[in-house]
């Protein structure tokens, strides 16, 4: 579910999309799976001179994302007292959409 939510947010991430639209795409996947109450933060935030900066992909941000922004893509589900899952990548917003610049593999490894 978290991976599907991340993919939905990434698909929406592009210059001109608002932070709320990007967050909403991911949040819908999580809510539709029954975990909406357990996603308590925004989809992502700007990464630059500081690790957390503008622009943010959150429900409150109605500003359009600028071309050239670098943002995190980090949806998560956290079940109190049990466990949490978060997948975090970094996106570069280009004129054509976005590029996921994180090169870590996404396949599930069972050890």
Which residues does each predicted region cover?
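Active-site neighborhoods and metal-handling regions in enzymes and metal-associated proteins
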Residues: 1-111
């Amino acid at each position: 579910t978290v991976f599907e939510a991340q993919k939905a947010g990434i698909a929406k991430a592009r210059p001109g999309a608002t932070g709320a639209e990007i967050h909403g795409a991911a949040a819908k996947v999580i809510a539709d799976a029954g975990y909406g109450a357990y996603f308590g933060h925004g989809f992502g935030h700007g990464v630059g001179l500081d690790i957390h900066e503008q622009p943010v992909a959150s429900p409150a941000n109605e500003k359009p994302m600028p071309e050239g922004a670098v943002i995190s893509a980090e949806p998560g589900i956290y079940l109190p007292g049990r466990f949490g899952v978060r997948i975090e990548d970094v996106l570069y917003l280009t004129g054509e959409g976005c590029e996921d610049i994180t090169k870590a593999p996404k396949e599930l490894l069972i050890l």
